[in-house]
Amino acid sequence: MSFLVELARGAYPDNALNGFTASSQFGLDNARAMMWLSQLAYETAHRDKVKSILDAWHLTMPAFIANDPATGLPPRSACVVVAAGRGATFVTFAGSDPLKFEDWITDFNAVQSADDLHRGFADAVETVWPVIQAAIANRPAPGEPLFFTGHSLGGALAVLAAARAAHEPNVQTTVVYTFGSPRTGGSAFFNGYALGNSTFRLINGTDIVPTVPPAQPGDYRHVGQSIQCPTDGRFDGAPGQISAAAANKPDIIDGAIAAGLADIRALAAFRLIRRIGPRPLDRLAGALPRMVRDHVPANYFRALSITL
């Protein structure tokens, strides 16, 4: 990955995962732990740095896939860190890096595959699946829970990988946390997805990425339970029962209207442009439209009451 999406080593607290429990129920402490793991996947250009952070978190690293482009046309890519410990195995995918060409190809290859998946996302998971499959089969305690997570593109890849992992031997519990994830497949994938009760889709404010690919045309659907907080708000509780129609929100037009109204309120309060986080990407995002600002990882950390 590039400097735009990385954090300094000292920004990763040693106690980041101390609130984690290997539960399939939604919990804010688990969401915070998954957000830290999602951020860690952005560090795959620095294997030693990732290993150092995992050591501090009392986790091992059974598998690591850096950001070298995969072979084949069009280029496909996925960056993955598999970690183990604390009673679970974690599979975390990196999101899109603005400076990484193959990520843009993955994102925009939105033609649906024969099995009703976003082709770019499905191809990226296929590229790394043998490594993930081996890590699952060889995890320290057979049958221990699997947690899949990722921000942005990483969340979409986490959903598709979790759906595959659920069919592996000795996999009883699979939990998914995503942050600002796009839609991943059509109605057939939605209807066959068996992890809806343990898939938690967090959306910050008017984040534009969960609105794409559009629900129409193409019949793209979200899966799992939606947890959304307002712009500049906080995630503060468990998701309620959500209908299939509501779960496919947000809509890009509704989001654009909400973002515009929020910008008007912010302008009136003299806070339209504000510091978001410590990275170059965060500083750039401060001047971008709200639907983009709400997507950056720093704003998900803030919404989870984590100070970077």
Regions from the PLM with identified roles:
Residues 1-149, 153-308:
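Non-catalytic, mobile gating and regulatory segments of ester bond hydrolases
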